[in-house]
């Protein structure tokens, strides 16, 4: 997690927040816990809530976004680039940010770290905007993409709760209440 390059990005900007969330996703993949990361990594305090929201949202939709990337990108990009795509695709799916602003800020985040990939990221995100309904329907054909849980967990729940496994998986992914 030492390799966070956000030095040219304004902390109040969405590009900084996408970049930080992507770095956290990569670190989780390397075995770090989010609790540990949020405690140890310096994040601009004003940006912290949005970085956390982006990170948690991306993790909740990891199966779907990874499925889309693996389906629509012939050569899988490097981990951090994939993580930026996951953050951006999740937000486009949830429709919580202005779509074109989100695409622009994701491309700025990529340009700050991996400028060679900005055209690819821009193309993937814009393609999603054009083909959103088709991508969402395609995700429903894959259990990991549909339920956003690993296949081993889906199989375990199917075996232990053959009549209730789908509701169990579905109730596990929404955001928690703000209480």
Spans of model-derived segments:
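Class I Rossmann-like S-adenosyl-L-methionine
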Residues: 1-179
């Amino acid at each position: 997690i030492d390799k966070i390059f956000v030095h040219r990005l304004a902390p109040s900007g969405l590009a900084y927040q996408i970049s930080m969330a992507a770095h956290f996703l990569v670190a989780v993949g390397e075995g770090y816990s989010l609790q540990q990361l949020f405690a140890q990594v310096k994040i601009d305090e004003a940006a912290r809530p949005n970085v956390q929201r982006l990170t948690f949202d991306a993790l909740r939709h990891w199966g779907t976004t990874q499925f889309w990337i693996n389906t629509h990108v012939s050569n899988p990009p490097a981990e951090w680039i994939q993580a930026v795509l996951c953050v951006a695709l999740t937000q486009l799916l949830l429709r919580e940010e202005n779509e074109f602003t989100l695409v622009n800020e994701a491309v700025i985040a990529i340009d700050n770290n991996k400028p060679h990939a900005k055209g690819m990221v821009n193309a993937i995100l814009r393609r999603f905007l054009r083909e959103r309904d088709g991508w969402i329907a395609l995700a429903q054909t894959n259990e990991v993409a549909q339920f956003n849980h690993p296949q081993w967990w889906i199989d375990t729940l199917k075996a232990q709760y053959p009549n209730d496994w789908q509701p169990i998986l579905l109730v596990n992914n929404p955001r928690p209440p703000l209480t």
